[in-house]
Amino acid sequence: MITYNKHIKLLAWLVASVAMLLPSSVLAQDENTQSQDEKLNTFTIDAELMTRGELRYGGLPDSEDDINNKASFILERTRLGLDYERTFIKAHITGQHSAVWGQAGKGSFNLYEAWVQLTSRQGLFAKIGRQVLSYDDERSIGSNDWAMAATSHGLLKIGYEGGAHKVHAMFAYNQNSESVNGGTVYRNGDKPYKFMQNLWYHYQHPRVPFGASLLFMNIGIQSELDNYVNKTHYQQLVGTYLSYKPSNWSAEGSFYYQFGRNEYDMEISAWMASVKASYSPTRQWQLVGGYDILSGDPFFAVPPGGGIGLGLVHHKTIKGFSPVYGSHHKFYGAMDFFYLSTYYNGFTPGLQNYYLGVNFKPINKLRFDVAYHYLAIATNTKYLDKTLGHELEFSAVYTPIKEISLMLGYSFMHGSKTMEELKRVDTNGNLHWAWLNVIVRPRFLQVKW
């Protein structure tokens, strides 16, 4: 286990090392560039205005008695971004407001991004502040941009990018406030973790369309239960992502394994795997197919101190995989019944997702997508069939100009008795979701000097 003092010492050493390593090379780079071009500075102001209306029938109820659930609402998200760039330095700030039309109060306003990055001629860089993380297919670390609040992290990132190689190391430490009287316990904060360290390596062959990534994550979480105050439990994730993308077809796959201990000091041993292939017979058509499997538990998990679960079986090992901080809406069906929302009473039976899709692009500005998902739990249970349901998805995207995107979609799921039992959805098994999304990305100003 990595202690609190070791975390602070390691972080201080890294900051000092980067500070000594970067300045001489970046200053020399800036001086050489200045002699050739006087306009070294670029300042940009842009925005993103997103409005999305949704209609749900048979969604996620608040209680067992509210099975037949309907909802319709309009969401809005507004971002204003300031960007500064010079030869060796970049800085970016994004303010974000999100709300439901008619919502009492002022909605949610936060500083979504606020970071500065120094880069050297040799490919070394350091980036510190609140920033968006997006790696590989975003299955484990992503922006989660479909959610109105999206996801960003306050951390230090250092790395190297050159030739066919990229290496990124990330270090995060979270606290509730700056008060020394509050101790070092971190609960109910902006992020679920107190400590996080990630190491990512990517290799892209310069002449062959093959890429490979390795990812390691170490996450320290403190429990909300009083029995576990002042204890930080660490869980790890390690895995790989591979892709091969020649001209008209592609194949990609990933495997991740989780281990360590969760916030209730329970052992973790979980895994997930995915494969995906696509083929484009013409420029207008693309066929897509794939399979995801995420390990699960055959029974409800109960922590040593109790407090959650049905109490049916006491687990010593958690086998239900958690996709941690990925962009979950991209996977496992567009209706977001899995991993963006939990199973009933915290059950984690895992998931299998078989899918097929067709994409049609009649013109450059217009695209239609159709997909089918067969969804099932991954474990054998004594009282439930594996099948969760069948989901059909239809969507269209129209981009009349680069600043404007119009999107709409409709999804239908026929859920099984297992779906009804685990997700408490509509008893007739038929679930509907329709949405319309409008995104405008204007650029107000860009100046160079």
Segments (PLM) and residue ranges:
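Acidic, His- and aromatic-enriched active-site or binding-groove loops in soluble protein domains
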Residues: M148-L156, P192-Q197
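Internal metal/ion-chelating core segments
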Residues: K166-F255
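Bacterial N-terminal signal peptides that target proteins for export
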Residues: I2-L14
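Extracellular/periplasmic loop regions
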Residues: Q258, M266-G357, E421-K423
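Flexible, solvent-exposed coil segments and beta strand-coil junctions
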Residues: Y57-P61, G95, V132-S140, M170-G182, ...
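N-terminal signal peptide c-region/cleavage motif recognized by signal peptidases
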Residues: P23-S24
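Outer-membrane beta-barrel translocator domains and adjoining extracellular loop/strand segments
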Residues: Y57-E64, G102-F109, E138-D145, S179-N188, ...
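Beta-barrel outer-membrane channel/assembly domains of diderm bacteria
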Residues: A28-G129, L156-Y160, P206, Y234, ...
